[in-house]
Amino acid sequence: MIDKLEIIEQKYDELTQLLSDPEIIQDQTRWQRHAKQQAGMTEIVDTFRAYKGVLQGIDDARAMLAESDPELQEMASLELDELLARKEELEQRLKVLLLPKDPNDDKNVIIEIRAGTGGEEAALFAGDLYRMYSRFADRQGWRTELLSANYTDIGGFKEVIVLIEGQGAFSKLKFESGVHRVQRVPATESSGRIHTSAATVAVLPEAEEVEIEVNPNELRIDVFCSSGAGGQHVNKTESAVRITHLPTGIVVSCQDEKSQLKNREKAMRVLRARLLEKAREEQHGEMASARKSMVGSGDRSERIRTYNFPQGRVTDHRIGLTLHRLETILDGDLDELLDALITTDQAEKLKTME
């Protein structure tokens, strides 16, 4: 591990020199490329340097233990205990930082939420999830943009697609893909019985145009009048757009903007993200079957998380974590939940490396 870290530190120092080279400074494209590469190494280099400082401190404390002065020995013993604990903490952090990085981690995300089992109640729950992720994004200082929405009569969503733009958005939200289940008394239920409904969530990294080149000849583009809740036509111009990617059969519709051009741009962003995800799945056969089961049919039996309103709890079934603060979670306070999923994923990766 130390050898790897020393190579990284050496590369970091080389980049520092390059960034002050007048020739590089004049070439902004090269300078930005080097600056981005160095920024990606800063945390691991800072942690490694702190680790080396702790190792030096341990050597110094052990030398003090050999002194004849009892007070110095006691001071050194206390310091040594603290330094050894810090050493273990930094070693663990360095192991995590050395794990292979998901190339999509720093990307923006497109979140697709679809109502599953449960009719209108499932559509209302899809709306709850949309607001939960939007509020989480607000807490992070990220930007959200509604790309597409298919409303129901009472304010829910049959489907809603949102773009979240922010540094590391995909790394934080990628484990949200799957079936989310809700248990509560529906607003439409007069007898007070608890119902179970489901909604599916798919989290896709946003694809840049350079990553996914779409041949215009492989697209069928249909335009139609956009409709609002209940299916009524909200304008008489054909501003809504449906794009079909003929080779894959992927279909994307967008009707939220009054401008056909803007709807087309939004639909293309979603299409590129879905094509990138398809390419990733084909490269990783396991991921393909994993996403199919995660997105699935929205059936209540294939769940990753349950939101239980009567008990005020949220349970993530993959890691066995239950939190009794459903209200704050639905208000976007997701850090504890997401961090636990990231930590579990890192621990599993570390096991495979041992």
UniProtKB/Swiss-Prot annotation:
SMART domains membership: PCRF
Q: Does the keyword Cytoplasm apply?
A: yes
Claim: Protein biosynthesis is one of the keywords in the record: yes
The record describes its post-translational modification as: Methylated by PrmC. Methylation increases the termination efficiency of RF1.
Q: Where is this region: Disordered?
A: 282-301
- Cellular component annotations (GO), alphabetically ordered: cytoplasm
Q: Drop me one GO molecular function for this one.
A: translation release factor activity, codon specific
Similarity-based family: Belongs to the prokaryotic/mitochondrial release factor family.
Q: What does this protein do?
A: Peptide chain release factor 1 directs the termination of translation in response to the peptide chain termination codons UAG and UAA.
- What this protein is called in its record is Peptide chain release factor 1
Protein's organism: Heliobacterium modesticaldum (strain ATCC 51547 / Ice1)
Q: What is the lineage of its organism?
A: Bacteria, Bacillati, Bacillota, Clostridia, Eubacteriales
List the gene name: prfA
